[in-house]
């Protein structure tokens, strides 16, 4: 039997995205993550997490990125729990040592890793417009067909692989990869006043 040791409700969202995230532990101390639909409208969103797992696993199968195992459960999904140091924590250690060259190198490595798989030229699609609206972007931008826009530094745990611990916001259409990189850097800088000088 698994016992819930942490729970977070995301019920401030639109009804079709409302979920609960639980961390559970079994009697052996093994941990698991459950993402559960809070209503019938959000079941499609939960199903999308499983679909994202399949898409990302295929995309990153020959890379240094690992997509933790995901299985379907009643009204939700169960994800493999990964512990370790996040890329954010690693960047903080480098930043607090004031080794700015290494910090930039590590962020460039992140950009290279996420750019290396499935890259192609950007085109605005109907699906893109539905999510991001009408925007003018160059068709020379590098993009990918499968994109986790929440691939921020806090969502990557590094051990022998780069483990993506949250892929709830993955889309199966072209998105400029520079947007994902920009978003990750912005969230990292804005996440702590200590990082403001960046």
Predicted regions and their residues:
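Conserved structural core of kinase catalytic domains
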Residues: 66-133
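A conserved mid-domain beta-alpha-beta active-site/ligand-binding segment of alpha/beta enzyme cores
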Residues: 198
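Hydrophobic residues embedded in beta-strands of well-ordered beta-sheets
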Residues: 32, 77, 162-163
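ATP-binding glycine-rich loop module of kinase domains
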Residues: 6, 12-58, 62-66, 87-91
